[in-house]
Every structure is written in C-alpha cells, then in structure tokens.
Curated annotation (Swiss-Prot):
Its EC number is 4.1.1.48. It comes from the Bacteria. CDD domains: IGPS (cd00331). One of its GO terms (molecular function) is indole-3-glycerol-phosphate synthase activity. Gene3D superfamilies: Aldolase class I. This is Indole-3-glycerol phosphate synthase. It catalyses: 1-(2-carboxyphenylamino)-1-deoxy-D-ribulose 5-phosphate + H(+) = (1S,2R)-1-C-(indol-3-yl)glycerol 3-phosphate + CO2 + H2O. Pathway: Amino-acid biosynthesis; L-tryptophan biosynthesis; L-tryptophan from chorismate: step 4/5. GO terms for biological process: L-tryptophan biosynthetic process.
Length: 295
C-alpha cells in the first residue's frame, strides 16, 4: 500500500482553548493521495444522508448482479470492451462537454461493449452515483462502479445505485483491506476488478489468491501519465500465470488506436477499459470503428 490515509491534525491546548494545527504530514503528496483523503470526507457526508443500514435494506429487493467476468470472457469482439462513461479528469479537465450518460450507454451497448464503467467520483471526475443510476436504467450490460473505494459503505452504495461490479485499487488498500472489501462484494454477489500498476502490486494480488479479474492500469495515478508499456511488460512476465489461474487480464487507459489494441490482444490481454478515446470524440461510433474494425 503506497498511499497514506489522511493523518489527523494534532490538538493543541492553550489554557481553555483547543484547536487543531495543520502540519507537513497533513499535505497530500500527489493527486491520488488527495483523492483518497477526500473520500473520507465524502463518505461521512453520504452517511449523513443515508445510513449503511438503510442501504442494506434497499439491497434486499434487488435482483442478483450481472456476471462481469462472463460477459468479458464471452465477448464477440476481442479483446472484450469495458466502455467507460467519464465526463472529466483531474489532468484533462472536462473531456466531454456534450455529456449525456443515457445516450452514451445505449450507444456502447449497440456497438457491442461487454460491460460499462461509470465514474462516480464527483469532485475530481464530475461523476456521481446518480449518473450510475441513470445508466442502469438505460442498459442491460453489467456495470462497473469506477471509484476510489476505501470503505464497505461505498460498495453498498454502488450496489443500490445499480452496479454489478466494483473497482479496488491495490495502491490505496492494504492486503487486509483488499480481502475485507472483496468479501463484502462476494456477499453481495458482485464482481471485483482489482487494479495494479506495477509488478509489486501484482505480486501482492496474486499472493492473495482471491481475484479473477485483474486490471493493469497504464496510467500512473500519482502523475496521471499513461504508458502502454505497463501492460506489455507485465504481460510478458505474468501471461502464463493468468492463463493457468483463469484470471482475465484487463488493460486500462492509454489505448488510442487499433495498433494499441492489436498489440494488447497479441500478448494475451482479454479485456480493455477505454474511456477518454471515446469521450473526446463527438461521434463515438466512428471512434469505435477506428479501434475495432481493423483488428
């Protein structure tokens, strides 16, 4: 686990006054840490509106989640596509001004996407759980709640909002947290896509022996720079292990052209998560065909 949790400001007493004093360790070291620290505040605010107990009650009447793994494995297009709905990002700002989640979801399904990823982080990506709910009403495809999950509360909220799967990021979670949150998802019959960015994180995940969907993020979440070599280098080392353990490797981010897609398919990548490439184009169908029709 590379990302710290927000340290509390120490309390200082002066006679009858107590106040918190900010210190150097209370400053986030990078974008990812800043996002994670803000999640603590966001979750507290969510709980003021809807309690965990109320979320659990709402889940009782929901149908079982859709099978994320199966949809990627049986995809007609190869590699299987997790198409992402994302309005903005910390590095690019607003990516898609003409943002209609319902229309985008319908388009993705018609084009043959296996699953859809929906950004739910509000402050940094201009996403929301309301967008996830809208997309759920617009498509029959399995939905991934794309967020920075650090609490069981977020998993229950994702399920109530229509998610079939969640993302867990190895860089922000300890091994104990990963196992605990995976058990929560398993109990709700939700799929889990666990995300790694380097061999150290991947080794951690493989040792846990709990995940059959592993996302290799080509974007360094500390700097938000992308490099497709991340997937290529890790696949050269771990492709045989993935195959033997029935793990579906998913390459995420930085996939911009048909050549990128073919390079990933040829080394054993079974699924790709693509968002910005579609979101920045006014004609999503045209962008899709540039990627998939030539491989």
């Amino acid at each position: 686990m590379e990302i710290r949790r927000r340290p509390p400001n120490p309390t200082v007493r002066v006679e009858n006054l107590e106040y918190a004093v900010p210190h150097r360790e209370a400053q986030a070291k990078n974008i990812l840490e800043e996002i994670v620290w803000h999640k603590d505040i966001e979750i507290k605010n969510f709980k003021k509106i809807v309690s965990l107990e109320d979320l659990i009650k709402k889940i009782e009447n929901l149908p079982d989640p859709k099978d994320f793994y199966k949809n990627i494995l049986e995809s007609k297009i190869k590699p299987g596509l997790i198409a992402e709905i994302k309005k903005a990002s910390p590095s690019k700002g607003v990516i898609r001004k003409d943002f209609n989640p319902e229309d985008i979801a319908i388009c993705y399904e018609e084009l043959g996407a296996s699953c859809i990823s929906v950004l739910t982080d509000k402050r940094f990506f201009q996403g929301s759980y309301e967008i996830l709910e809208t997309v759920r009403k617009s498509t029959n495809l399995p939905l991934l709640c794309k967020d920075f999950i650090i609490s069981a509360y977020q998993i229950y909220k994702a399920r109530v909002s229509g998610a079939d799967a969640i993302l867990l990021i190895a860089a922000i979670l300890s091994d104990d947290d990963l196992i605990y949150l995976k058990k929560i998802a398993d109990n709700l019959k939700m799929s889990v896509l666990v995300e790694v960015h380097n061999d150290n994180e991947l080794e951690r995940i493989l040792k846990l022996k709990s995940f059959n969907l592993i996302g290799i993020n080509n974007r360094d979440l500390k700097t938000f720079k992308t490099d497709l070599k991340t997937s290529i280098e890790l696949m050269h080392i771990y492709a045989d292990i993935f195959l033997k353990q029935n793990i579906l490797p998913i390459s995420e981010s930085g996939i911009n052209c048909a050549q990128d897609l073919e390079s990933l398919r040829s080394i054993g990548i079974k699924g790709v998560l693509i968002g910005e490439t579609f979101m920045r184009e006014s004609d999503i169908e045209k962008s899709f065909k540039k990627l998939f029709n030539s491989i």
